[in-house]
From Swiss-Prot:
Signal peptide boundaries: none
Location of the Kinesin motor domain: 132-460
Protein name per its UniProtKB record: Kinesin-like protein tea2
Protein family (similarity comment): Belongs to the TRAFAC class myosin-kinesin ATPase superfamily. Kinesin family.
Annotated coiled-coil segments of the chain: 530-557
Region (Interaction with mal3): 2-122
Annotated compartments: Cytoplasm, Cytoskeleton
PROSITE patterns named among the record's database cross-references: KINESIN_MOTOR_1, KINESIN_MOTOR_2
Biased composition (Polar residues): 589-602
Native organism: Schizosaccharomyces pombe (strain 972 / ATCC 24843)
């Protein structure tokens, strides 16, 4: 069907940009202005994600690497950016207009030629496209010391296979070793050519409900990461696959809705790391009751466009383990696995279908390094790749009894890489293997081992099945949504009730606190009143005692005064006896008055100093004792 005639589809996603690019670092000039900077997903170049219409700033000259092509030059002459413009790096359009038209027509032809039938669960079941296993070889551009290698297409081969041949001459004979694969890409090949011939059918099958896996295998520095991620001008397999997947979703003519989620992890020194979540907790490999191998906890994020995928991958690549090696300035030191989950919902049949695409960038095998950390990393990398080779060899032998390889125990658990790829390698996913090689003479052994690995992978078992549709998921989801809304209303009601009760409780607590304060204050007042009453009672007793004492003292004073008066009278009488009667008579009146005055003066209270008062008290006391 034509894309122009298809009706709008409710995908549940933001409409993706067509044929957008995956963000990467392109080859650029070195600081000296010559040479080239190898591609690196972690190179700290700034990018502008918000504006894709600004053309890239370039120099007018065309440069090549004067020191020979690097692992990521791939024999292509690049237009390099002029110095000082890296911080203004923006992304240009991915394809020329003619390529856009070609891709659109190609997709329309695929839609019109692929037969479909509706299964019992309401899903349209597309015929499987391509073969179960696709093996491809990519030759890195030659630096120097080229070995004796050749490649080409087999003539009259019904499968359209291609060969790569090594010819070794000795003094007595010529030895020729030939390997056959689905595709052999020469040094002049482009990333899009590789994607179109080796990966595109896998992506289409994923859209149709099958699982697929694409992984790059090869020696360090042969262009695995370049092939998988690409550069700004030449996007790799991952961005091209995401572009195609979103394009298929956008042009789908059914009423199905789609969701695309991705996870991204790395295996470094046999430790799994969630690159998206980037938490301290190490994810663990778990196997459920149905035999499915999963990683938990692992972050899966919803993406709505290729641009979002680009940004997520770029942020993850910035923290991925890389280091300089003898072959490459930026070399991946870990296996990276990007998993894409396509969730397809049929609202009519109330079914859902989940298919997955795994994009694996394996760390490169290498010889032992003198650097301690690189040597340790290399040991883990080589061990996992050796286990992968053993697993593939024994799976191939089990699937093809005619092979002489050992088909004994399959050591999936000896490496976390093979444990994660267990289901895919055992035939449940369509496999596309891209083996990258270098045909330089000093890499002959590594190249031969890589070709043997890819040859064995062609014999892996195939039991590819379409993902099952889960029935009534949509209806159950609608029911759950309804229950969720009801629960939300109840939660809102109870939340308001709790708020009101909380307010009432606070008011009650305030009132109780006030009563407690009043009670505490009343208790204090009562205690003070009792204390005052006790003190008052004590004072009353003291006052009564003082009054009694005062009364006693007054009686003593009266007695003393009376005694003094009696003494004065006695003295006066004695005086009268001594003087003549005449004088006595003459002075009677005056003497009486004087005695009266003297008595009056004695009755007056004298205010004396303390010591005199004490002396007087003592004399009074003595006199009182005498009187008594």
């Amino acid at each position: 069907m034509s894309s122009s005639s298809s009706k709008p589809v409710n995908t549940g996603l933001v409409t993706p940009r067509r044929y957008s690019t995956m963000t990467g670092i392109r080859t650029g000039p070195s600081q000296s202005g010559t040479g080239s900077i190898p591609y690196s997903p972690t190179s700290p170049l700034s990018r502008n994600f918000s504006n894709y219409s600004i053309p890239m700033l370039r120099s007018n000259s065309t440069q090549t690497n004067v020191n020979g092509p690097t692992a990521f030059d791939l024999g292509v002459t690049e237009k390099l950016m002029s110095p000082g413009t890296l911080d203004r790096y923006t992304r240009p359009a991915l394809y020329p207009s003619k390529d856009l038209d070609y891709l659109k027509n190609e997709y329309v032809n695929y839609e019109s030629t692929t037969s479909q039938q509706t299964n019992s669960k309401g899903l349209k079941e597309s015929n499987f496209v391509g073969s179960g296993i696709i093996t491809s070889i990519r030759i890195r551009p030659i630096g120097k010391n080229q070995g004796v290698w050749s490649h080409g297409k087999l003539s009259n081969d019904p499968y359209g296979r291609e060969y790569i041949r090594q010819q070794t001459s000795t003094s007595s004979s010529t030895i020729q070793q030939e390997y056959l694969f689905n595709n052999v890409f020469g040094m002049e090949s482009k990333n899009y050519d590789i994607y179109k011939r080796s990966v595109k059918s896998v992506v289409r099958n994923v859209f149709s409900g099958y699982n697929g896996i694409v992984f790059a295998y090869g020696m360090t520095g042969t262009g695995k990461t370049y092939s998988m991620q690409g550069t700004e001008n030449e996007p790799g397999i991952i961005p091209l696959a995401m572009n195609d997947l979103f394009e298929m979703v956008e042009n789908n003519s059914d009423d199905d809705t789609f969701q695309i989620r991705i996870s991204y992890l790395e295996i470094y020194n046999e430790r799994i790391r969630d690159l998206i979540g980037n938490s301290d907790e190490e994810p663990r490999i778990r196997e459920n009751a149905s035999g499915e191998v999963n990683v938990t906890p692992l972050t899966r994020v919803l993406v709505t466009s290729p641009e979002e995928v680009s940004q997520v991958i770029e942020q993850c690549n910035a923290i991925r383990k890389t280091a300089a090696t003898d072959f490459n300035t930026y070399s991946s030191r870990s296996h990276a696995i990007l998993q894409v989950f396509l969730i397809r919902n049929n609202p009519t049949a109330h079914t859902s279908q989940i298919s997955s695409l795994s994009l694996v960038d394996l760390a490169g095998s290498e010889r032992a390094s003198a650097h301690h950390e690189r040597r340790k990393e290399g040991a883990f990398i080589n061990k996992s790749l050796l286990t992968l080779g053993t697993v593939i060899s024994r799976l191939s032998a089990a699937a093809n009894p005619s092979l002489t390889s050992n088909s004994g125990h399959i050591p999936y658990r000896e490496s976390k890489l093979t444990r994660l790829l267990q289901q895919s390698l055992s035939g449940q996913s369509q496999i596309s293997l891209l083996a990258t090689i270098s045909i330089e003479s000093n890499h002959t052994m590594e190249t031969t081992n890589t070709l043997k690995f890819a040859s064995r992978a062609q014999n892996l078992p195939q039991d590819i099945r379409q993902a099952e549709a889960v029935t009534n998921v949509q209806a159950e989801l609608a029911s759950l949504h309804s229950a969720l809304e009801k629960n939300a209303q109840e939660v809102e009601y109870y939340a308001s009730l709790v708020k009101q009760l909380t307010s009432d409780l606070e008011e009650r607590d305030t009132y109780i606190a006030m009563l407690e304060a009043e009670r505490s204050q009343g208790t204090a007042i009562s205690r003070a009143r009792l204390r005052m009453e006790e003190l008052l009672s004590d004072h009353n007793f003291e006052i009564a005692d003082l009054r009694d004492e005062l009364q006693d003292k007054e009686q003593i004073i009266y007695a003393l005064r009376y005694a003094q008066k009696q003494r004065d009278i006695a003295d006066f009488n004695q005086s009268l006896a001594k003087f003549p009667h005449k004088i006595l008579k003459k002075n009677v009146t005056r003497g009486s008055r004087s005695s009266s005055d003297q008595f009056s003066n004695e009755t007056k209270t004298e205010i004396l100093p303390d010591d005199q008062q004490q002396s007087k008290k003592d004399s009074v006391t003595q006199e009182t004792q005498l009187l008594s």
